[in-house]
C-alpha cells in the first residue's frame, strides 16, 4: 500500500474513532428550538416545570437530571421528539414534533438537552 493510501486509511480510522463534535452553534440553535417547542411543558431550564406541564397528570421529563438522561441514547431522544411519547412507550402527552422539525433541528435539540444534563454524559460509556 502506498503512502497516500496509508494516510487516507489512517484519516478514515481516526475520523471514525473521534467522538462526534457538536458545535456551540448547534447547541445554541437547539436551545432556541427547545424554548420554542419544549419549554411550555419542560420549562425554560428543562426541569419539567413548564406552565403547561404542571397541569398534566404525568410530569414532563426533567432534562437536567443526568442520572436519568444519560441512560437514554441519542437515538431514543430523537425518536421521542420526532414520533411522540406514545410511539416509544412513554407518555402520550409528549407530542410528535417530526412534522414541524427536521432531523437536524431535532439533533440540535438533543445536543442542547445533553448540555443541560448534570452530570453530563461521558463518551465511551
Spans of model-derived segments:
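Axial heme c-ligation environment in periplasmic c-type cytochrome domains
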Residues: 54-62, 80-116, 121-125
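Electrostatic cytochrome c docking/interface patches
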Residues: 18-33, 123-125
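Gly/Gly-Pro-rich "capping" loops immediately C-terminal to redox-active cysteine motifs
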Residues: 31, 47-78
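Positively charged n-region of N-terminal signal peptides that target proteins for export
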Residues: 1-8
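Stable alpha-helical elements in mature extracytoplasmic
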Residues: 26, 33-34, 73, 77, ...
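Bacterial N-terminal signal peptides
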Residues: 8-18
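The canonical Cys-X-X-Cys-His
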Residues: 30, 34-44, 94, 109, ...
Amino acid at each position: 500500500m502506498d503512502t497516500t493510501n496509508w494516510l487516507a486509511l489512517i484519516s478514515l480510522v481516526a475520523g471514525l474513532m473521534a467522538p462526534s463534535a457538536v458545535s456551540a452553534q448547534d447547541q445554541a440553535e437547539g436551545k432556541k428550538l427547545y424554548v420554542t417547542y419544549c419549554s411550555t411543558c419542560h420549562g425554560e431550564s428543562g426541569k419539567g416545570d413548564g406552565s403547561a406541564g404542571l397541569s398534566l397528570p404525568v410530569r414532563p421529563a426533567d432534562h437536567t437530571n443526568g442520572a436519568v438522561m444519560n441512560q437514554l441514547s441519542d437515538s431514543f431522544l430523537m425518536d421521542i421528539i420526532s414520533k411522540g411519547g406514545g410511539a416509544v412507550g412513554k407518555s402520550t402527552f409528549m407530542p410528535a414534533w417530526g412534522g414541524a422539525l427536521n432531523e437536524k433541528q431535532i439533533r440540535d435539540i438533543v445536543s442542547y438537552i445533553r448540555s443541560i444534563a448534570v452530570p453530563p454524559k461521558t463518551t465511551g460509556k
